[in-house]
């Protein structure tokens, strides 16, 4: 009789003796042993471990640039609005009066 073939783990047989395959991290399995892929920062994930992009100035200095939240010294809210939006203030009357709930049943 031939020896059994090595099998990869399955949900019904998770204790297979075959070596596990390396997997890349996923949201459901973030602790994979495969090396993580380098990612560039995004607005939803600004703390990426990818190296920051840099630009070359005329003086020859290498400066880090934040591509997603540019800073404009003229407008203190530019980091919230982005490079293309302007700050617009508008006053809207809002009423905060609410009818009180019926408390007769508490007595």
Swiss-Prot record:
Residues 1-44 have a biased composition (Pro residues). Residues 2-49 are annotated as: 3 X 17 AA tandem repeats. Residues 46-58 have a biased composition (Basic residues). Keywords: Repeat. Sequence repeats lie at residues 2-17, 18-33, 34-49. It comes from the Viruses. Residues 1-63 are annotated as: Disordered. This is Latency-related protein 2. It comes from Human herpesvirus 1 (strain F).
